[in-house]
Curated annotation (Swiss-Prot):
Part of the 50S ribosomal subunit. This is Large ribosomal subunit protein uL4. The keyword Lipid metabolism does not apply. GO terms for cellular component: ribonucleoprotein complex; ribosome. GO terms for molecular function: rRNA binding; structural constituent of ribosome. GO terms for biological process: translation. One of the primary rRNA binding proteins, this protein initially binds near the 5'-end of the 23S rRNA. It is important during the early stages of 50S assembly. It makes multiple contacts with different domains of the 23S rRNA in the assembled 50S subunit and ribosome. Pfam families: Ribosomal_L4. InterPro entries: Ribosomal_uL4, Ribosomal_uL4-like, Ribosomal_uL4_dom_sf. Belongs to the universal ribosomal protein uL4 family. Keywords: Ribonucleoprotein, Ribosomal protein, RNA-binding, rRNA-binding. The keyword Transcription does not apply. Residues 52-77 are annotated as: Disordered.
């Protein structure tokens, strides 16, 4: 069972926390992590690329010139894909690129991402994280105390509006609740700063 230090917002160690081995102590499955990241990025694609087909190009109802006798190549419509400004055959159309991996695979990927943070020593557990008012400077100071000022993912058990607003303007810092924790954000940020209550919520869902 992994055991990590418990810190306060001043960066002082105030205890230790035992993490659930089935959630934070498993093997890191890189293939599953890759599949999960590709799935998330595919779901974010806009899918708005579009070309005009035969039915979409304006004009072309009349034959441009008679079939024979002009010396030119025969033509039936200015909408032909051979013509400049004509139709595009089998071109892209608006579509949804999103898809879903099986639930067991998604959970395995999330457990692998969390285990990678523990393995690399990039998880910081806080006793609590609350702010009386939103202030970016205060949030930057807290992260500096924790040696997590660059590319940190901040996770709390419930929505903390003041924490969220304070973290929003810091480059490389992202705020999530434990319900929104995901593989892409875990891998995209160097440090995971998570409260003790959020750890309990994550373990409750994934254990």
């Amino acid at each position: 069972m992994p055991r990590v230090a418990l810190y306060n917002i001043q960066g002082q160690q105030v205890g230790e926390v035992d993490l659930d081995d089935s959630v934070f102590g498993g093997e890191v499955n890189e293939a599953v992590l890759h599949d999960a990241v590709v799935m998330q990025l595919a779901s974010r694609r806009r899918g708005t690329a579009a070309t005009r087909g035969w039915a979409d190009v304006s004009g072309g109802g009349r034959k441009p010139w008679r079939q024979k006798g002009t010396g030119r190549a025969r033509a039936g419509s200015i909408r032909s894909p051979l013509w400049r400004g004509g139709a595009v055959i089998f071109g892209p159309q608006p579509r949804d690129y999103g898809y879903r991996l099986p639930k067991k695979v998604r959970r395995l990927a999330l457990r692998s991402a969390l285990a990678s943070k523990v393995r690399d020593g990039n998880i910081i557990v806080l006793d609590e994280l609350k702010m009386e008012k939103p202030r970016t400077k205060d949030m930057a100071h807290i992260l500096k105390n924790l040696n997590a000022e660059n590319k940190a993912l901040v996770v709390t058990a419930t929505r903390e509006p003041n924490v969220e607003l304070s973290a929003r303007n810091l480059p490389g810092v992202r705020f999530l609740t434990s319900d929104g924790i995901n593989v892409y954000d875990l891998l995209a940020h160097d440090k995971l700063v998570i409260t003790k209550d959020a750890v309990a919520r994550v373990q409750e869902v994934l254990a």
